[in-house]
From Swiss-Prot:
Highest taxon listed in the record's lineage: Bacteria
Keyword Transferase among record annotations: no
EC assignment: 6.1.1.19
Localization per record: Cytoplasm
Keywords in alphabetical order: Aminoacyl-tRNA synthetase, ATP-binding, Cytoplasm, Ligase, Nucleotide-binding, Protein biosynthesis
GO CC aspect terms: cytoplasm
Gene from which the chain derives: argS
Protein name listed in UniProt: Arginine--tRNA ligase
UniProt-recorded Gene Ontology molecular function terms: arginine-tRNA ligase activity; ATP binding
Motif stretch ('HIGH' region): 119-129
Amino acid sequence: MHTLIKGILEEILEEEVIVEYPKDREHGHYATPIAFNLAKVFKKSPLAIAEELALKISTHEKTQGLFDSVVACKGYINFTLSLDFLERFTQKALELKEKFGSQVKSERSQKIFLEFVSANPTGPLHIGHARGAVFGDSLAKIARFLGHEVLCEYYVNDMGSQIRLLGLSVWLAYREHVLKESVTYPEVFYKGEYIIEIAKKANNDLEPSLLKENEETIIEVLSGYARDLMLLEIKDNLDALGIHFDSYASEKEVFKHKDAVFEQLEKANALYEKDSKIWLKSSLYQDESDRVLIKEDKSYTYLAGDIVYHDEKFKQDYTKYINIWGADHHGYIARVKASLEFLGYDSNKLEVLLAQMVRLLKDNEPYKMSKRAGNFILIKDVVDDVGKDALRFIFLSKRLDTHLEFDVNTLKKQDSSNPIYYIHYANSRIHTMLEKSPFSKEEVLQTPLTNLNAEEKYLLFSALSLPKAIESSFEEYGLQKMCEYAKTLASEFHRFYNAGKILDTPKAKELLKICLIVSLSLSNAFKLLGIEIKTKISARD
């Protein structure tokens, strides 16, 4: 509806028009502040301009039957949609069913490469990884729903010093807990019960001869063994959140193409040698300083691997590349973009979204750390505690780039203080009414909407506004808008439900038809959030 109204107004006024929702629902369904901009051009008051435009719009042939009223108010132009228009849009939504909200013009379709999570396979996924994981998965769902082509990839950092350290940590745990030797651990190593688990499992799975080689060979064997086990566990953790990737890219495999990439950087005059190191001239592209790619010992930095990986990605020529990183990687953006420019790519095609920290509470106290993983809260522990749907909803309920703190006990409450419960409860109420109704679903669907009051019309309008919520969520990377939409719609429905009996009125079929649209919109919104909406739920509020 929003796109349609905007298009009609722009055609009539021959100006770009901002169409927004009024702060006060009594002012109508939509509003535009265009008169404020035009007032400066025509040197008239915004109210005078608004009155002229309101008359022009209301009398134009393209708006006949579209609006009940077009009113100038304090410089704004407020629009109230006609019931006839809402009825036509309702029929279209009911015909689209689970596709309602997916309308997108084919020429706007994009090919998107979405990389997220990409946690090192050196330990189980913790709660900090979950936020970016859930966001990326839902962003992909929304993008595909809108007609875009999306590839979701997990970049596996399966080489380098952290993988060797994993193997060393397992080897030391093996010596201590299997061979019962006295062991001195280094200052930095991976700790936690999972390391001991891997060591004991290696004792059962690996050929005994492999663990009797020289220490460097043993560490190499255990590095690969532990890495593979961790990657399997990571996939299980993601599965518990309902997340599945289209592909997993191995850093070890990708880095085999490093020579060609470095040759290209050399040709672009992007490298120089200083202090026995090879540097990237990233400061030429807004980076704070140049960056080391090859260290004195001839080993490569993490950045070198990232550059080779991004070269592999950009060779595939997607419309847009989206990376979801932890907020602590903010400084990496400029250096990666610099490398893309040196390699001849358009770095503006890369968008990096940063996920801020998560702080979990339970009974207003910090959530207990996992003994298995050391100083982390594991995804699996929280999913087992509150369920994947509640966890997904709360992670998506705030902007990705803002800090998130919540008490998991809120997600266990069966009352209006628990937002996901309250949305489920709205849908449950609708399905209970439909079961109790003497009318068949077909009767309800075929009933024309002819006799709705202002509140009923507004509830219908809110339910039909799902497409705008979906579009805004994607375009602004603001998935919290989907959560806000679902919460607001559920709240409006509960107010409507509590205001009076629905089944015992002459227009019961009309009201049930509104309820069907509300249920459809809530269901479609939740599906895009990766949540299955419930049709049966108990209530204690």
